[in-house]
């Protein structure tokens, strides 16, 4: 088994959609980034890549590459899933936290879990997502950005045991 930790942050800005966990969330601002800036998916991908000792999302999907401009992070997650299986692993579980003062994430968490479990070909019970605020402190508390943390456990597939 292997464990990986991921973290991502993006600045909130006008004239962008807010997409988190593959869900478009109604909000007056969205996240700024080269791709769709899905902070949750980016943290999850980094945790998986870390568990596989394959670097980070900047190595695999550089923001200097026009191919990834405006990219759907769920499609990038599909690529990361292929790396998991090619290395002989499967998802054990993923536990993630979204850190945002607003909007409230609770109404969207089940859709996020469903999206992620489908792409990673794992039971929805293996995907946990929590949301918290920083009580008005820091850049997330000041509503300047949104952050996410993720930890994953990868298990060897049965054919590799």
From Swiss-Prot:
Binding of 4-CDP-2-C-methyl-D-erythritol 2-phosphate, residues: 8-10, 34-35, 56-58, 61-65, 100-106, 132-135, 139
Keyword terms: Isoprene biosynthesis, Lyase, Metal-binding
Any GO BP annotation: terpenoid biosynthetic process
Reactions the enzyme catalyzes: 4-CDP-2-C-methyl-D-erythritol 2-phosphate = 2-C-methyl-D-erythritol 2,4-cyclic diphosphate + CMP
UniProt cofactor(s): a divalent metal cation
Enzyme Commission identifier(s): 4.6.1.12
Site (Transition state stabilizer): 34, 133
Residues that hold a divalent metal cation according to the record: 8, 10, 42
CDD domains, per the entry: MECDP_synthase
Pfam families, per the entry: YgbB
Pathway: Isoprenoid biosynthesis; isopentenyl diphosphate biosynthesis via DXP pathway; isopentenyl diphosphate from 1-deoxy-D-xylulose 5-phosphate: step 4/6
Cofactor note: Binds 1 divalent metal cation per subunit.
GO terms of molecular function: 2-C-methyl-D-erythritol 2,4-cyclodiphosphate synthase activity; metal ion binding
Keyword Lyase: yes
Record's subunit section: Homotrimer.
Sequence similarity: Belongs to the IspF family.
Role, per record: Involved in the biosynthesis of isopentenyl diphosphate (IPP) and dimethylallyl diphosphate (DMAPP), two major building blocks of isoprenoid compounds. Catalyzes the conversion of 4-diphosphocytidyl-2-C-methyl-D-erythritol 2-phosphate (CDP-ME2P) to 2-C-methyl-D-erythritol 2,4-cyclodiphosphate (ME-CPP) with a corresponding release of cytidine 5-monophosphate (CMP).
Name of the protein in question: 2-C-methyl-D-erythritol 2,4-cyclodiphosphate synthase
